[in-house]
């Protein structure tokens, strides 16, 4: 998909770049697969900010995605490819032969009219979903489960994929795009192919307002705050942070400091993404 640039009629248009998506459905989404969403502004039930830089944005409805793909041995036809405002990937509307419809993450190369199916012994074909134990080693997959029948959790964003590199006993070894090597149970499902809309990272919003449409608020530097608001705040003019190392607003070291504490899943990571 090519990029489109605009005439420089304003600073925002001069910098903007959009991805051309001619095959995306231009009409309304399927009504029965929509749910309402309410904005939180990053606040919890006490009204306190728990996630910073969230607020505003266009009103959106959630598209219910079938991440489990547990409707086995029933063929489905791709009715159309749609835009989803809640994720970077596009979604595909499926129509099963029994009349049921559902949304899935659209793989790269999937198009209207294609036939796909889920099950333990289905063909190795783009869009088909089956357990890792039945997928040939070396195959590129996406929408991978971390626990059997829990639903896809890995490789769901635009352009992402995972490669099946080995199988040993009840485990399958996956190579992530980050370079991490990870083991998951071979009973976990995955979908053949990689996620579409791979040029999403090439787009340029062009102006701050476009980011606000997405519900993202500005990020203020700690050094620009007062001492009451941030450990880096205060001082005369543009003074330094005053700490031996940069910290978060809560005093935790940042910029390279490792904070991952999850011994329960560490045993499944064969090689980390940093080598």
Swiss-Prot record:
Gene3D superfamilies: 2.30.30.30, Nucleic acid-binding proteins, Ribosomal protein L2, domain 3. Part of the 50S ribosomal subunit. Forms a bridge to the 30S subunit in the 70S ribosome. Pfam families: Ribosomal_L2 (PF00181), Ribosomal_L2_C (PF03947). One of its GO terms (biological process) is cytoplasmic translation. Residues 24-47, 227-261 are annotated as: Disordered. GO terms for cellular component: large ribosomal subunit. InterPro entries: NA-bd_OB-fold (IPR012340), Rib_uL2_dom2 (IPR014722), Ribosomal_uL2 (IPR002171), Ribosomal_uL2_bac/org-type (IPR005880), Ribosomal_uL2_C (IPR022669), Ribosomal_uL2_CS (IPR022671), Ribosomal_uL2_dom3 (IPR014726), Ribosomal_uL2_RNA-bd_dom (IPR022666). One of the primary rRNA binding proteins. Required for association of the 30S and 50S subunits to form the 70S ribosome, for tRNA binding and peptide bond formation. It has been suggested to have peptidyltransferase activity; this is somewhat controversial. Makes several contacts with the 16S rRNA in the 70S ribosome. The keyword rRNA-binding applies. This is Large ribosomal subunit protein uL2. Belongs to the universal ribosomal protein uL2 family. The gene is rplB. Keywords: Ribonucleoprotein, Ribosomal protein, RNA-binding, rRNA-binding. GO terms for molecular function: rRNA binding; structural constituent of ribosome; transferase activity.
